């Protein structure tokens, strides 16, 4: 009986957290045509894309729950600092924001000769909901061009620069 209750509680929590846009984002990756001394291996490209998309998930969860600690795995440097500041500011006024990415159009534009950074451009479509506690204040569709620079850490690529340019 305890097992059934646990499953029901976990299922309810999962359903509640995925109610706003449960669909997975469509991802399109443009072929990489980098000119330079260091070729981008397919395994590295796949890892960068996987980790960048995971960072989007962490970003959305952190802003929804107002928990900057959720950024630790996927963000470093100025990207992490700016997002943490945003979380602190919205929490201070009692708001939280839900991001649901709908589509990513990714293009890797730079891979450093030392292999210490990769820059990508992401034309992303997403939905934004701003909530005051659990009351929805606004829901908007957005399209932006993100510039991201990722650097390798011990086991994954982490986002160091995460800058949006609205369209």
Where in this protein do the model-derived segments appear?
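Polar/charged side chains located within well-ordered beta-strands of beta-rich proteins
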Residues: 56, 101-103, 122, 127
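Amphipathic, hydrophobic N-terminal targeting peptides for secretion and organelle import
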Residues: 1-34, 164-166
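Short solvent-exposed loop/turn micro-motifs enriched in small/polar/acidic residues
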Residues: 54, 101, 141-143
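Short solvent-exposed beta->alpha transition segments
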Residues: 39-42, 68-113
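Exposed beta-sheet edge and beta->alpha loop/turn motif
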Residues: 19, 113-167
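Short, low-complexity N-terminal intrinsically disordered segments enriched in polar/charged residues
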Residues: 21-77
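Contiguous, function-dense segments enriched for cysteine-driven chemistry
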Residues: 25, 32-40, 48, 88-89, ...
């Amino acid at each position: 009986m305890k097992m059934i209750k646990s499953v029901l509680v976990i299922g309810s929590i999962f359903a509640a957290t995925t109610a706003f846009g449960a669909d997975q984002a469509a991802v399109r990756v443009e072929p990489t045509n980098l000119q330079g001394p260091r070729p981008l291996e397919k395994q590295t490209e796949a890892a960068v894309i996987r980790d960048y998309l995971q960072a989007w998930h962490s970003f959305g969860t952190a802003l929804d729950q107002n928990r900057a600690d959720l950024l630790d795995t996927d963000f470093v440097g100025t990207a992490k600092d700016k997002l943490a500041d945003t979380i602190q500011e919205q929490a201070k006024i009692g708001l939280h924001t839900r991001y649901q990415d709908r589509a990513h159009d990714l293009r890797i534009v730079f891979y450093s000769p030392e292999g210490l950074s990769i820059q990508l451009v992401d034309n992303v479509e997403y939905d934004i909901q701003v909530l005051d506690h659990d009351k929805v204040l606004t829901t908007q569709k957005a399209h932006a061009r993100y510039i991201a620079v990722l650097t390798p850490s011990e086991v994954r690529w982490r986002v160091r620069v995460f800058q949006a340019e609205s369209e």
